[in-house]
Amino acid sequence: MKKKNIILISVLLGALLLITGCSMDPSQNTDGFFSTYLIQPFTSFIMFVAKFVGGNYGIAIIITTLLIRALIMPLNLRTAKAQMGMQSKMAVAKPEIDEIQARLKRATSKEEQANIQKEMMAVYSKYNINPIQMGCLPLLIQMPILMAFYYAIRGSSEIASHTFLWFNLGSPDMVLAIIAGLVYLAQYFVSMIGYSPEQKKQMKIIGLMSPIMILFVSFTAPSALALYWAVGGLFLAGQTLLTKKLYMNKHPEIKVMEQEEKEFEQIVEEQNKEK
């Protein structure tokens, strides 16, 4: 789990550095693979959609965002299904894992710790558990799309100069930035449904990093990007709820594990109060 968190944090930081660190004017360089095959087609498609909605680039961006999310949705659902399967295996293996972790805490020598860690790996192998085998691919696929979208907005004077609702698409908007951050914060809490308290603690840093990054970038990026995040985040929250409904009932042991951990935490809290 720690290794997976490190990978995801690296990916998110990479996206942040790419967006905030690239200060070149995209209109000055129209050549190259990225510009030719990603940025320009993106710009053309947004303008194409805008023609059908009265030249409203805000609505065109919303439609484009929903189309992007719909295209990525099968991959996200497949990843979510794999994650549910992994949670199910972890729930079944939990008694053995807890016993090994308890002995690992009591271990006094490095040799003893190494032997116990080998036992842990044996349990993972026994139940075919590999926490890092899924989870990063959808994020990696979205990164070039996000970058193309960002530069398509910056490189198009038509999009950048358009006003939608109360904000200009080419300029930062604090209110929309906060909305985008809050949407992804809500999405984080939705995504934690079904996870055990222990897993929620492990995922807390990486889970909160995404809305913080989105909020930070949206304060300085064109508001069209914050619009993309806000709409995409709402879609993702709905998709996550659908995923939980589709797959969680197939793995009742996940709910049992979560309920047992909640009951255990309540017992510990009551004991602490009595003291």
From Swiss-Prot:
GO terms for biological process: protein insertion into membrane; protein transport. A lipid is attached at C22 (S-diacylglycerol cysteine). The keyword ATP-binding does not apply. It comes from the Bacteria. A lipid is attached at C22 (N-palmitoyl cysteine). The chain crosses the membrane at residues 48-68, 132-152, 174-194, 212-232. InterPro entries: YidC/ALB3/OXA1/COX18, YidC/Oxa/ALB_C, YidC/YidC1/YidC2_Firmicutes, YidC_ALB_C. GO terms for cellular component: plasma membrane. One of its GO terms (molecular function) is membrane insertase activity. Residues 1-21 form the signal peptide. Keywords: Cell membrane, Chaperone, Lipoprotein, Membrane, Palmitate, Protein transport, Signal, Transmembrane, Transmembrane helix, Transport. It is a multi-pass membrane protein. It is found in: Cell membrane. Its main location: membrane. NCBIfam families: yidC_oxa1_cterm. Required for the insertion and/or proper folding and/or complex formation of integral membrane proteins into the membrane. Involved in integration of membrane proteins that insert both dependently and independently of the Sec translocase complex, as well as at least some lipoproteins. Belongs to the OXA1/ALB3/YidC family. Type 2 subfamily. This is Membrane protein insertase YidC 1. It comes from Listeria innocua serovar 6a (strain ATCC BAA-680 / CLIP 11262).
